[in-house]
Regions:
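Membrane-interfacial amphipathic/re-entrant helices at transmembrane-helix boundaries
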Residues: 1-23, 51, 63-66, 93-104, ...
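Inter-helical junctions in multi-pass inner-membrane proteins, predominant
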Residues: 2-12, 165-169, 196-235, 241, ...
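Single transmembrane alpha-helix segments in multi-pass membrane proteins
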Residues: 5-57, 86-98, 239-240
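Helix-loop-helix "hairpin" substructures at the membrane interface of multi-pass membrane proteins
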Residues: 16-17, 142-219, 243-249
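Pore- or pathway-lining transmembrane helices of multi-pass membrane proteins that form conduits
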Residues: 47, 54, 90-118, 224-236, ...
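Alpha-helical transmembrane segments within multi-pass membrane transporters and channels
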Residues: 60-110, 248-253, 257, 284-285
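Transmembrane helix-bundle core of multi-pass membrane transporters
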Residues: 89, 98-167, 194, 259, ...
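Cytosolic-side transmembrane-helix boundaries in multi-pass membrane proteins
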Residues: 94, 179, 186, 190-193, ...
Length: 296
């Protein structure tokens, strides 16, 4: 069992878990405030990855700079989608079940469009670039510069968003909307404005995650689907709409995947992830960190 004490595995688990947490943050913001199931979330990660790739390859712009542009582009796409499509859906005040069903279909269509456009523009070939790929030995653990930067930036963004939600006026408004939309409106929260902010911020975080992932992974037009699945598993584990719970669940999923594969085989990766997912749904459907709702 010496493998469990491996610093190399610990580092890999932290990087993967923090990445899952960051991706799931954006998905959780959109679902928590609006009950919309964004199955195109991973395709926004793909969009951010291609922005970083092309800017670095053709203009030698560092991904640490292009991540801001990727975030703005993805957030702008989110704002357009909200104003053009989802604002009217939300204004109709449909039931949560109907909203989820409608959003599932709409986002699925958006996902197909984004994947096909990316395939036409960038082709389906795998692409990659070398950035901060020097290997450093820290405490006996070998780590590349890009993965170390990725870990530090991902943790920083998660901490910054948590502080934003706890300390800023708009952050508190988002939390109020997550808890109860009607009550938030009664106390003066501009629901439509906060929904637009959450939608744009959720999309932007996915674009940001894509640029960080592109520094150490190959990218393709169809790279987003596994990240979408992982993000949904994370928000189920952490509790739907539970932002801190989602961060903890992302880290937990990263550890389960890395250590589970190390103890078994890479071929069991999907079995491990979906096994945990199904087990939580059966035993604790509100999530590991969610609160049980009592209906009276």
């Amino acid at each position: 069992m010496e493998i469990l004490a491996s610093g190399q595995l610990l580092f890999s688990a932290l990087v993967l878990g923090a990445t899952y947490a960051l991706i799931a943050l954006g998905l959780n913001l959109v679902y928590g405030t609006m009950r919309l199931l964004n199955v195109a979330h991973g395709d926004l990660v793909m969009l951010g990855a291609y922005v970083a790739y092309w800017l670095f390859t053709f203009m030698t712009v560092s991904p640490l700079l292009s991540m801001f542009l990727a975030m703005v582009i993805a957030a702008g796409l989110g704002a357009l989608a909200y104003v053009g499509i989802f604002r009217r859906q939300l204004a109709e005040r449909a039931t949560a079940g109907r909203l989820e069903a409608n959003s599932l279909l709409l986002f699925f269509g958006l996902s197909v469009i984004m994947q096909n456009v990316a395939s036409l523009v960038f082709t389906g070939s795998l692409r990659a670039y070398q950035y901060l790929d020097e290997v450093y030995i820290i405490g006996g653990v070998a780590m590349t510069g890009n993965r170390l930067v990725m870990l530090l930036l991902t943790i920083s963004v998660c901490v910054a968003l948590t502080l934003f939600l706890r300390l800023s006026i708009y952050g508190l408004a988002i939390k109020a909307l997550i808890q109860n939309r009607d009550a938030a409106a009664v106390v003066g929260v501009n629901v439509e404005r906060v929904q637009l902010l959450s939608f744009s911020l959720g999309f932007g975080l996915a674009g940001l995650a894509g640029t960080l992932i592109s520094m150490s992974k190959q990218i393709s037009p169809f790279m987003g689907f596994p990240f979408t699945i992982a993000a949904f598993i994370v928000i189920i584990l952490g509790g739907l709409g539970n932002i801190p719970g989602g961060i903890l669940a992302g880290l937990l999923l990263g550890f389960l995947e890395i250590y589970g594969v190390a103890l078994t085989s890479p071929m069991y990766r999907s079995v491990l992830l979906y096994g945990v997912f199904v087990g939580v749904l059966i035993l604790r459907p509100q999530g590991l960190f969610g609160l049980r709702r009592i209906v009276r």
